[in-house]
């Protein structure tokens, strides 16, 4: 199902497959490292591999999205449809697109994943062995995601050539404008009076939830 969602978004079997494959590699490496460290999967952390898979897919999607922007438009997907279509002539080859994607996402990706590692590692202060093992499992998994999504995936993308590039580019342009009316309608809420109404409604909901939360 995850692969299907990625395919519908990227319109590419190759990009969807590479993202899922790198996420699975992160999970397999995590299980192998845990075995080497003398740990295993118990009922407490049996869902951790799925969590690591989801995190890896999320960061992998960012990489393929930037890669696709480079091979379609030669940069970020910013500007009007006509501007993006005109930038199609600046599209780069897969090798250069992978290099640019790696350079742009390496630092923010590492910072984000290291923050996740620190967050999971902080759970180890709880003096319960099963909880500490859960923290170790998640920390190792997120750390390995740095290698799979920020190093392995760009290398694989550098060898990836997409077919029907012009058709995929036009489809992406339609994707970018598909929800313009929805965003235009929601942008009304950014005005002072509608924004104040939203804040007031949120305050009422918070107070209601706080009152009933004490009874749980």
Predicted stretch roles:
Residues 1-216:
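Membrane-embedded transmembrane helical bundles of large multi-pass transporters/channels
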């Amino acid at each position: 199902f995850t692969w299907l969602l990625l395919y519908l978004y990227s319109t590419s079997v190759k990009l969807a497959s590479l993202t899922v494959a790198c996420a699975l590699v992160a999970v397999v490496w995590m299980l192998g490292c845990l075995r080497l460290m003398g740990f295993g999967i118990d009922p407490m952390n049996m869902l951790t591999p799925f969590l690591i898979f989801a995190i890896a897919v999320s960061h992998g999607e960012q990489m393929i999205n930037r890669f696709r922007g480079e091979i379609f438009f030669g940069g970020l997907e910013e500007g009007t449809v006509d501007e993006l279509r005109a930038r199609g002539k600046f599209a780069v080859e897969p090798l250069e697109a992978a290099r640019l994607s790696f350079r742009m996402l390496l630092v923010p990706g590492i910072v984000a994943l290291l923050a996740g590692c620190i967050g999971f590692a902080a759970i180890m202060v709880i003096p319960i062995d099963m909880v500490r093992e859960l923290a170790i499992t998640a920390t190792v998994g997120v750390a390995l995601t740095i290698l799979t999504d920020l190093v392995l995936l760009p290398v694989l993308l550098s060898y990836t050539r997409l077919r029907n590039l012009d058709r995929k580019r036009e489809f992406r342009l339609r994707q970018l404008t598909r929800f313009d009316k929805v965003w235009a309608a929601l942008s009304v809420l950014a005005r002072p009076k509608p924004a104040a109404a939203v804040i007031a409604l949120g305050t009422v909901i918070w107070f209601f939830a706080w009152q009933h939360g004490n009874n749980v």
